[in-house]
Amino acid sequence: MSIRSKFNKDEKKFVKFIDSTEEIIKHLNKSDSSKRSRLKLSGQQIDVLESNFKIDSHPNSATKSLLSNALSIPLKNIQIWFQNRRAKEKTARDGGRRRSGNAEIEDGEYEHGKMSYQAMCPFDFPPQERYFL
């Protein structure tokens, strides 16, 4: 029940060999605490991002870089903010409801993509006698 350490000087990597379940649990708990915390944006930063989103919901890399520098936010967070904001807008536009694969349409038919149920199945339902002659 010990931790053996091995240091490879060439690769400059530190490797731990864990021998017991207790040590594995301890190691996993340590990993959770090292998780990066969420970046909190100020109201002013959000206002700037929102105003830019109204102008262009898909900004180019130069615009994102300028926003990153001006707002002191990492570029990756700018990209993620725009991605999340586009998803939020799409959800609001769709009415906030999830769409299923099949949407019921008039006449009791079901639409799947662009092909209606009748187009997929050439038989009449319920089956008529002519099919069983």
Swiss-Prot record:
Residues 34-93 bind DNA. It is found in: Nucleus. GO terms for molecular function: DNA-binding transcription factor activity, RNA polymerase II-specific; transcription cis-regulatory region binding. SMART domains: HOX. Transmembrane segments: none annotated. CDD domains: homeodomain. This is Homeobox protein HD-5. It comes from Encephalitozoon cuniculi (strain GB-M1).
